[in-house]
Each structure stands twice: as C-alpha cells, then as structure tokens.
UniProtKB/Swiss-Prot annotation:
Official protein name in the record: 24-methylenesterol C-methyltransferase 2
UniProt xrefs under Gene3D superfamilies: Vaccinia Virus protein VP39 (3.40.50.150)
Assigned EC number: 2.1.1.143
Species whose genome carries this gene: Arabidopsis thaliana
UniProt-listed InterPro entries: Methyltransf_11, MeTrfase_SMT, SAM-dependent_MTases_sf, Sterol_MeTrfase_C
Protein's UniProt keywords contain DNA damage: no
Alphabetical list of PROSITE patterns matching this protein: SAM_MT_ERG6_SMT
Domain of life (superkingdom): Eukaryota
Pfam families assigned to the protein according to its UniProt record, in alphabetical order: Methyltransf_11, Sterol_MT_C
Family statement: Belongs to the class I-like SAM-binding methyltransferase superfamily. Erg6/SMT family.
Amino acid sequence: MDSLTLFFTGALVAVGIYWFLCVLGPAERKGKRAVDLSGGSISAEKVQDNYKQYWSFFRRPKEIETAEKVPDFVDTFYNLVTDIYEWGWGQSFHFSPSIPGKSHKDATRLHEEMAVDLIQVKPGQKILDVGCGVGGPMRAIASHSRANVVGITINEYQVNRARLHNKKAGLDALCEVVCGNFLQMPFDDNSFDGAYSIEATCHAPKLEEVYAEIYRVLKPGSMYVSYEWVTTEKFKAEDDEHVEVIQGIERGDALPGLRAYVDIAETAKKVGFEIVKEKDLASPPAEPWWTRLKMGRLAYWRNHIVVQILSAVGVAPKGTVDVHEMLFKTADYLTRGGETGIFSPMHMILCRKPESPEESS
C-alpha cells in the first residue's frame, strides 16, 4: 500500500471517528442516534412512498379539499420526521426566544414552564397537553409544577417514544400519554384542571374544532394557554415573497393553512372561552427565536452527509434523505418568516372557561 493510499485511508478513518463521536454521540444523548433513524410506525420499505404521498397532499395547503384526510397525513408526517427531530433538534418539537446567557436547552425549558405558570395549576392537579409529541414539554412542565400531565398525540410512534422518555426521566408517575385525535379526544367532559398546547393546534384543519374539544374537557373556571403559529400584521397577501415563505412553511410542516393572528382570539371566543391575555411572544424585546435555525446550517450539511451514507448502505430507510432535505428547506422558510416578521410560532393566547354558561353570554 503506497503512502497516498495510506493517507486517504487514515483520513477516512479519522472522519469516520469524528462523525460517530461528534455527530452521533451528542444525538444519542438527546434520545436518538443517527444509526437508529426510521420511518416511525411506517415500515422501512414504505417510507419513500409515504413521503411522496405526503408531499403531493400538502403541495398547496390552502387548496386542500378533503380536510378529513388531514389528520392521517399529519400522522404520516410525524412518522417521517420524529426520529430526525429528536436526533437533530431534541425532544421538544418547538421554538423559543433566545435568552442572552442561556443555552438553547434552558431557553426551551423556560418557555415551557411559562405555559404552566400562566394557567396557574397546583401540584397534584390534572392538566392536558394537546399535541404532546414525544413529551419534551410534558416532562419539563411536570417537573416544574408537580401536576399530573396527560398528553395526547395522534402518532402511535410518538406515544411509545414519550413513554420511554418519561420512564427514563423517572416521571412516568406524573406523565401519561394517550394516542388519539385532538379533534375527538377520548376524555370526559369537565375532567381537566388546565390545558396547554405548544405549537400543536396549527395542524388542525379548523381551529374551532380543537378549541371546542379543549373547552369541553376543561373544568369550569380552568384555563388554557396556547402558543400558535400565525401570520402577523406584517404579512401581505399581495407580496409574492411573503406568500412563498408562508407556503413553504405550510408544506414542510404539515399545516392545512396558517391562520392570521387576528383570528385566534375570535375563534377562542366563538367556542365560549374568555380571553385573559394575548401576546406575540416573538415580538421585541424578545430575542430572535430563529437564531438556532441559522446556527444549525453547518450541522445540517454535516448531518445530511450522515443521512445519505446511512441510506446508501441500507441502515436508514430509502426516503430519509428526501425528508431531511425537506426539513432543511423548511428551516430556511421559517428563518425568512422570522427575519421579515411575517410569521410567528408563538402567538400566545390565555383563555378561561367560565364558571357558568351565563358568564360567557
């Protein structure tokens, strides 16, 4: 073996060690390794076909004619992206404003804890996490409040991941996870002391339907807080660039059309809620929530090569590269939406279910 061959062989080994220690290692501490990437509940041989079906369905989100199919495709979306989210982002599938002097992890936790502080629950009370994902916010909120948290997600794979994480964190006594559609929740009327949703109800075809369900299961006098994805007052429908950005966000995040910020409170009032407080948590003086997306561009290219290699050798399912590429493009649209101020993923609305029907009339 000549010296040039030895050099390239050594370089390849060094690169391989770097990837597995510096890329795959940190991801494993988040709960998912690159070598474990899968299609969730979708069998490996069907990942690529499911991705194509998803992309075709959400090609023009606001023109979707069969809204009843949206929940099924949202389920497909989370089968496709959950492992990649955990590996590349963490267990909390949402954004938070940057906080000077704080890590992304701490900023995320504080953003989650604020939600439960707003609804003023006490230790031992039962609260609902509407669209809980793999349970990152649930665990932070249960630890902070000592309330019993019941999470619901439409995706069975996420249910299993959340239960695994809850047990590892020693929080399975406080955290329960249910597989179900938040448009038809399997809970009794007036059964929760509070509820929250963190960037989750944006997947509902009609916001009124999920708000009505949350209203139904809350006890009278209890509060609900939501961080909503919205277009802001800066969005101009006649601006082609604005439209491109918003459509890019919708397609890449399984959204059947983003709502305008002015529609959120009106929808909540329509189902019977009183509005306690409303604020865009992304507005100044809040630090940019998209900083982490911009900082992660180098990591994306690094991770994309990992995904390509794992897919080529058959470790990751075919179609994983397409999904990863879609998420990178979506991250660019999200960043542009944040920088231009036309989009916010954290329009906060705090609502209260009246003590009696007469109060809301």
